[in-house]
Amino acid sequence: MTTLSGAPLAGQVRFAVLTPDGRLIIHSAPGRASDTEWGPYQEQLWAAVRAEVDPHGGDINGIELHNGMRAKLADAAMAATTPGHYLPNPVASVVLASLGPPPTARHGTVAIVGTEDDQGRTTSLTTHQLELINHVYRLATQTPQ
């Protein structure tokens, strides 16, 4: 687990990743947004999230979590039809259930991103959000502080 202290580098957006082998990794990606007909789009951030969550090019779904966070995960139907690509992720299942959505089995790598601001841009996970994720992760893995 990487450190939770300090702010991200200027222009970077921090997000958390829960891997099927039980790791919690904090990543960052450029957060610059381009204007599109649908609003601002953070191409580099979403490419980094997609590379973690679904490198096989399937659909990605989003789930609203507590404290303004959102989870990004591989489409459940895609994960069910190609289980070799999307391994069971019991730690993510527990972490997400603790952060809002009903308990269900999750598969593949799961990303947790920060709050969407009034302009539609996803912000970096705050120190408080990272501490909450880390706390729930420790409980899910029975890791002492």
Please identify what each model-predicted range represents:
Residues M1-Q145:
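Short beta-rich binding modules
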